[in-house]
Amino acid sequence: MTTRSRVHGFSLYRSGLVFLLCLPYFFLEGGCTKQDPYVPPDLFYYFASYKVGKNPTTVTPIDVNQDGVTDLVTTNMSSNTLSTLIGNGDGTFRDQVQLHVCQEPRSLATGMYNQDLYPDIVLACSGGDEIAVLFGRADGKFIEGPQYPVHRTPIAIASDDLNGDHIADLVVALRNDKLKIFLGLGNGEFRHGAQYEYGDTPTSVALSDLNADGKMDLVVTNGGPMSNAVSIWIGNGDGTFRQPTDYRSGKRPLGVSFGDFNNDRIRDLLVINGERDSFSTFLGNGNGTFQAGRDSGADAGPNYGLVRDFNGDHRADVAIVNIQSSDLSILFGKGDGTFEYPPRNYRTKPGPFSVALYRVMTKEMEEPGLVTVDNGNGTISIFLHRGLKPSASSKPAASS
């Protein structure tokens, strides 16, 4: 018998076996049916868009006036501005207030840097090769604080207490393969800390305690062609870090977020890969190390993602914005670091660059809202959970 006939023979044998296995169910259950294809739940709906500055890159939920309601701030690179939108608490926001800031503000960090009652902001100013501090006020506006030069093109910034003095510090990623530490003084000023040269084109930074020792650790995505990795820097608790450990990611990793994908109460990583339309999950071991990454498919041009249980099944899901296909993808987790496919996609305005989660509160419940920053449209767009139905009178006119 030839190889081809053996293959066909196996196929016929397998078909007969399936028929024999199915035969009892045919008489008892009325026949054998194919498993229905997976259909992702439709949990969100587009609600409204709001104008911000030109080419916005980040949106950050923050209660700027401390009234218990989430507000939003965006960095707008091409207009050199910061937009503040005061929240009404029902998923809607007032019109933006713009503040002219530094050259090409690309990303921001928030904290109580001068230890008053109102949150402050530090901007990574790519066009000015500096970071700029803004102090919050009771009316929700910001005033300029000190600026600190950095060597070249700050790309990303993160903030937490790095040296155990209960004062917020900063980590800044620079385009020339450097990481710069700034240690807070508690009065809104900073002093220069350690500087590290490592990796290839850092694209994002994030801080968390990854080994449960009470000290902040650092995660950096390196998007250059010589790296394509996520680097784990274990903190020493004094504002310095040990030599990093690299984990291979997909091509051109752009952003990293934390979550718990397998419900073991250990921090895992979500890494968005800008090329080849994928994202990677890394399951944590609890000691600052991670298992090898698992790649999953995304839509065209994923740019940023976040982690949250959106459907209440106690399994972490992810929301990803895709800048080329101009949509928001929700992928529902299986509880092991993998995800159901296909995702639920929602059309966005052109060029969604980032996404953030914010609280929407009603008298009956609290639900997650999602906000995308639309780089190609100069807007932010609100997507509300279907458990929330604000009245038609509260819905603002959508911006084009």
Give each language-model segment a name:
Residues 78-80, 127-129, 176-178, 224-227, ...:
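Short glycine/acidic-enriched loop and turn motifs that connect beta-strands
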Residues 72-75, 121-124, 170-173, 218-222, ...:
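Hydrophobic beta-strand segments that make up the repeating blades of beta-propeller
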Residues 1-12:
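N-terminal secretory signal peptides that target proteins for export/translocation
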Residues 68-70, 117-119, 166-168, 214-216, ...:
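Glycine-aliphatic tripeptides that mark coil-to-beta-strand junctions in extracellular
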Residues 57-66, 86, 106-115, 135, ...:
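Beta-propeller blade termini
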Residues 353-399:
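Blade-level signature of beta-propeller repeat domains, shared across WD40, Kelch, NHL, RCC1
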Residues 32-54, 86-103, 135-152, 183-200, ...:
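Blade-edge motifs of beta-propeller repeat domains
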Residues 15-29:
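Bacterial N-terminal signal peptides
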